[in-house]
Amino acid sequence: MGRTENIDNGSSNEEKVALFRELFFGRQDVYARRFENAKSGRSGYSPECANKWKRGVCGLPHVKCGQCGNRQFAPITDEVVRAHLRGRDMDGKPFVMGVYPMQENESVRFAALDFDESSWRRDVSMVVKTVRKLGLPVALERSRSGKGAHLWFFLDADIAARTVRAALTYLLTVTLEEHPEIGLSSYDRIIPCQDTLPKGGLGNLIALPLQREPRQVGNSVFVNDDLVPLADQWAFLSSSSSVSRELRECNAENGKQKLITTGERSSPGNRGRFFFHGGGRM
């Protein structure tokens, strides 16, 4: 799978959009859009509908989207990504998108670890050390709020969500074994959150980075291990490495041990879900 290379801040918008779509590749037939309700103060993400607010077609506000017979998911296009990066849609309204990482065959092309509490700086630092020790490339993003972080793992092939989740669980387990005192209390979840898609569902979503307004205050951007924003976000993304076999194997102790999963859903610290094998490839 090729990667758009040699992109930097000075590259064309078309090149940036192409790179962004390659790295954050999930379901292409649907995306989520961030909403804010000024009256209730509520905010979140929901699947975008191609028929939203179309007169005579859209049932809002009297019919909920999930109950509307005219609901039609809007697909991801270059224009959707451009709107995300500039922070406004074609009508000038605020625009932030999220993607559904799990494809219909229950594989993913990226994964992430989400940290979202007061101890996130310490916890992220420890997990990053584990990742570096195991030789895995990772991209560290400060969250939209500035009060958390995502560790992104870009894959160079479609990999079963179950396999990816098991590998990331292993990274967390190794970190806890080496630093039991930290507890990883800020750890929130692995993305994708599920091993398999719920029947008729889309799975979880994740908000994408490089959101325009948060970016202006140093949030929703990629940072170095000291949490300092990188000067050229596009050059970093263009030169970022992908993993596939490495994530499957998660080598430890100089490559002598490899993660094997029982196929059961796992969670951090649930060590009964793993055993180790000294040789061979998965």
Name these PLM-found stretches:
Residues 2-11, 192-199:
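Intrinsically disordered, low-complexity regulatory segments in eukaryotic proteins
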Residues 7-147, 154-170, 177:
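Signature for HUH/AEP ssDNA processing cores
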Residues 19-26, 207-210, 282:
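Short, hydrophobic/amphipathic alpha-helical patches that form generic packing surfaces
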Residues 30-31, 244, 280-281:
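N-terminal processing/targeting junctions
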Residues 99-128, 156-271:
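DNA replication initiation modules
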Residues 270-281:
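N-terminal low-complexity segments that are often proline-rich with Ser/Thr-Pro
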